[in-house]
C-alpha cells in the first residue's frame, strides 16, 4: 500500500491535491503535512478529515528530525512537495 506525504497540504493548491488523492486512491494512506501559517487552513480539508486513509500532521518541513520521524512513523513511500512561503 502506498503512503504518500503531501507537504503544504492545507494551502491553496495543496488542499486540492490532498482531496484528489484521498478520494481517488482509497487504498493509499495520505499524510498531509502543514505548519498552518498564514496560507494553510484546515477548513479547506474539512470534507476529508474523517476519511480512513487521511492523516494530518502539523510540522515545519525545515525541522529535519521531526520530518524524519514522520517519514518513518507513516512508512512514507512517496512525497509531493507543495509547501512554500510566498
Regions found by a protein language model. Give the residues of each.
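N-terminal Rossmann-like NAD(P)+-binding domain of SDR-like oxidoreductases, especially those catalyzing
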Residues: 1-86
